[in-house]
């Protein structure tokens, strides 16, 4: 299993994970459920109409936190918002109810991955494994 696959596996096992962004000078955290490992990058998706996307546009610093029952993950870096239409199509294929809502409301899904990123797999007391990802 590759390093990025290890990180993806923890996020998958967690089911719900958390995305932290910056809003002005304040942190904002919210739960997310969608992620997709595609071309050796983990993509996340949020609506471009949402505050979270606007926060990422203004300040690309972001962090994912997840707990899979065994490991705590901190995965942080710079959100690359260039998008990937193939990822959006796959997201809508995997989540048809979301696709319907987005289509009905004329919304767009913004997908991003973390670049210049660090992933820390931790226990309660220390970092067990650490990985760097630069694309």
Where are the model-predicted features located?
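Charged, amphipathic alpha-helical segments
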Residues: 1-5, 46-49, 96-97
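A short, Trp-centered hydrophobic/proline-enriched beta-strand micro-motif
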Residues: 9-23, 62-64
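General beta-strand recognition
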Residues: 18, 42-43, 74, 120
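Conserved beta-strand in the GNAT
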Residues: 31-33
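Charged, gly/pro-rich active-site loop segments
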Residues: 74-135
């Amino acid at each position: 299993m590759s390093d990025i696959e290890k990180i993806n596996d923890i996020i998958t096992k967690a089911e719900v994970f958390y995305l932290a962004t910056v809003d002005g000078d304040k942190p904002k955290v919210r739960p997310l459920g969608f992620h997709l490992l595609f071309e050796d990058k983990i993509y996340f998706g949020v609506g471009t109409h949402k505050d979270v996307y606007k926060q990422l546009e203004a300040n690309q610093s972001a962090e994912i936190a997840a707990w899979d029952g065994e490991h705590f993950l901190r995965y942080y870096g710079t959100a690359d918002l260039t998008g990937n239409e193939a990822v959006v199509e796959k997201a809508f294929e995997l989540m048809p109810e979301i696709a319907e809502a987005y289509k009905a409301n004329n919304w767009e899904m913004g997908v991003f991955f973390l670049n210049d990123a660090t992933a820390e797999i931790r226990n309660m007391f220390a970092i067990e494994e650490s990985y760097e990802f630069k694309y």
